[in-house]
Amino acid sequence: RGWQMRTNWSKGVIDLDQTRRAAYALANAPQGALKILACHHPLVEMIGAPMSGEVIRGERAARIFNDCGVDLIMTGHVHVPFALPITMGDRASYGVGAGTLSMRERGAPAGFNCVEWDDVAVTVTALGWSGSHFEPQRTWRLERRQTPKAAALRAAASISS
């Protein structure tokens, strides 16, 4: 963890050199690959989350990842599930937060996310502890970026309906 000149150091700080190295690797992924980045803190403010973001250099990192085509930025820290677009320019990555397996209640039951995808969309299902087992709590369907294959599938689906 880097040094921060603020009293609440739990808000996090982003190292832009690490960000650029990760973005370079992700930008060179095969065409059509689902690009997922995992980090502890949500990079930008997620409306509806129980805690504020305020990650130092988080907005800049989000823009870098968005520009290199990252589909999902998977995070924790706030301990509640969410899936929200991070729209910058004409592209959108999604910020996807997971719960925690801790039994200490934080506004959502203990839980985790299940992620499934195809060429058109990513489906994120938040599973929560019911007291005896994990069960689906909420599901988000997130459209993938427009790759040529995804565009063709969307066009074919709209013609047939």
Predicted features along the sequence, with ranges:
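Short, catalytically relevant binding-site loops at active-site mouths
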Residues: 1-2, 41-45, 79-81
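Divalent metal-coordination and catalytic microenvironments
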Residues: 22, 37-40, 77, 115
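Residues that cap or initiate secondary-structure elements
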Residues: 25-28, 43, 121, 130
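Short acidic, glycine-rich surface-loop motifs adjacent to enzyme active sites
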Residues: 30-46
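Conserved beta-sheet core of the metallophosphoesterase superfamily
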Residues: 47-125
